[in-house]
Every structure is written in structure tokens, then in C-alpha cells.
Swiss-Prot record:
Part of the energy-coupling factor (ECF) transporter complex CbiMNOQ involved in cobalt import. This is Cobalt transport protein CbiM. The lineage of its organism: Bacteria, Bacillati, Bacillota, Clostridia, Eubacteriales. Forms an energy-coupling factor (ECF) transporter complex composed of an ATP-binding protein (A component, CbiO), a transmembrane protein (T component, CbiQ) and 2 possible substrate-capture proteins (S components, CbiM and CbiN) of unknown stoichimetry. Residues 1-24 form the signal peptide. It is found in: Cell membrane.
């Protein structure tokens, strides 16, 4: 599992990574007016606190999940660091939040998303501190909520299809929300919010639809690896104790 996973992620990085540093990941530092920065921050904070509580409850009853939680966070960090310049002040990239939402639920991903976005803003100059709330809301809140809902709705019919659609639609949701955030901050000259939204979304779609499909396929691959090696991840743990939103261990 270790070698196959490393090889796949390495190939994915080589294919999608671009050295262009002129664009910031997500919404760039200073790009949103202060009022909108505060607005999105206020919307994101309750979800982050909800996620902290959820992580505390999960790890208190199942401390062995720390490694899996770290893996979900690393998956988000690696995939969301692969950027393709798109709309001015932002860019297109995979998000990686679908896997964690499937395994742990949407609340946990708000915390992991916040940590990843903060590290990337501080260490990689991707995104920003002032726009952290907006980026957390799009990638750490709305994307995982859709991914989790899609997976729960379809998992009993076909698990692989459910994982693929959950990851892909979670990715697209992130960019729909980002387009809405940009449209609200920078409406069309006519003042029509929908016109501005569809302008941003149409530009994102050129790169984001192929990325969403690719992320869905990669997430299915990683999900299957985790499922196949669950005995190694949980040595000696009775099957009846493998419960919770992390479905692959059931």
C-alpha cells in the first residue's frame, strides 16, 4: 500500500503541479474587502468549533484513529497544493476533502481544512490570512457537507460510485461557493449577482471539471487501499468496535 500510494500521488503531483507563483491558491490575501472577510470568518468559526468537538469525541473513544485522521489531513494538503491558475485572485486545484468527509464526517473536515489552509497561507503563500474564513467555508465546510451527503445517499447501492461522486461533487461544490464569494464581492457592472456568478463559474469550469473527475478516481483508489488494508490499520481491533462515520472500517 505504501509504495503504490506514494507512486500514484507522485505521478499526480508531476502531472498537475505548475511552478507559476503569480497566482495564490484559493482566494488570495487581500483580494476580498474587509467586510466580506469578516462575514465568511463568522460563518466558518461555528463549524470549526463543531469539528473540534467531533474530533475530541472520536479520538476519546477510538484513539487508534489518529493515524487515519493524519492521513486524511495529508491527503487534503497534498491535493490542494496542486494549483492551476484560473480566475484572477484564485486558481483551480483538487481539494481532497471528499475522502476525509467519507471517513469521519463533515465536521472533522472543517478543522482539517482550516489547518491545511493556514499552513499553506503561512508556509507556501497560497491563499491568505484575511481570506482564511472564506476559503475554509468553501473547501472545509460546504465541500465536505456535499461529499458526506452524496456518499451517505448512494453507499448502499454502489460504494465505488458513491465515493467517486462524493469526491467529485464535493470538489465542484467548493468552486461553486468560491465563485459565489467572488461574485458577491465583485458583482457585475449591472449589479446582477447571477451574471457575475456564472462568469466566475464558467472560467473555473474549464479546469475544474477535469480536476473533479480525476480527484474522484484518485479518491476511489485510495479508499479501496484503505479498505483492503484495514486489518493493518487496526491490528487486534474487533470488527464490532470499528464503528462510526468512518465507514470503510465497518
Amino acid at each position: 500500500m505504501k509504495y503504490w500510494g506514494t507512486a500514484l500521488l507522485g505521478a499526480f503531483c508531476v502531472f498537475f503541479f505548475t511552478p507559476n507563483t503569480a497566482y495564490a491558491m484559493h482566494i488570495a490575501e487581500g483580494f476580498l474587502p474587509a467586510g466580506w472577510c469578516l462575514f465568511w470568518l463568522a460563518l466558518s468559526v461555528p463549524f470549526v468549533f463543531w469539528g473540534i468537538r467531533s474530533i475530541h469525541i472520536s479520538l476519546r473513544g477510538n484513539p487508534h484513529l489518529k493515524m487515519l485522521l493524519g492521513l486524511a489531513g495529508a491527503f487534503v494538503f497534498v491535493l490542494s497544493a496542486l494549483k492551476i491558475p484560473s480566475v484572477t485572485g484564485s486558481c483551480s486545484h483538487p481539494t481532497g476533502v471528499g475522502l476525509g468527509a467519507i471517513l469521519f464526517g463533515p465536521a472533522v473536515m472543517s478543522v482539517l481544512g482550516c489547518i491545511v489552509l493556514l499552513f499553506q497561507a503561512l508556509l507556501l503563500a497560497h491563499g491568505g490570512i484575511t481570506t482564511l474564513g472564506a476559503n475554509v467555508f468553501s473547501m472545509g465546510v460546504m465541500g465536505p457537507l456535499v461529499s458526506y451527503g452524496v456518499y451517505q445517499l448512494l453507499k448502499k447501492r454502489n460504494t465505488k460510485v458513491a465515493v467517486f461522486l462524493a469526491a467529485s461533487l464535493g470538489n465542484m461544490t467548493t468552486y461553486m461557493v468560491t465563485s459565489l464569494q467572488l461574485a458577491m464581492a465583485f458583482p457585475d457592472k449591472t449589479g446582477n449577482l447571477l451574471v457575475s456568478f456564472f462568469k466566475f463559474m464558467s472560467i473555473f469550469a474549464i479546469t475544474q471539471i477535469p480536476l473533479a473527475i480525476t480527484e474522484g478516481l484518485l479518491t476511489v483508489f485510495v479508499f479501496n487501499l484503505l479498505n483492503n488494508y484495514r486489518e493493518e490499520l487496526y491490528p487486534g481491533l474487533p470488527k464490532e468496535e470499528r464503528s462510526g462515520p468512518y465507514d470503510f472500517v465497518n
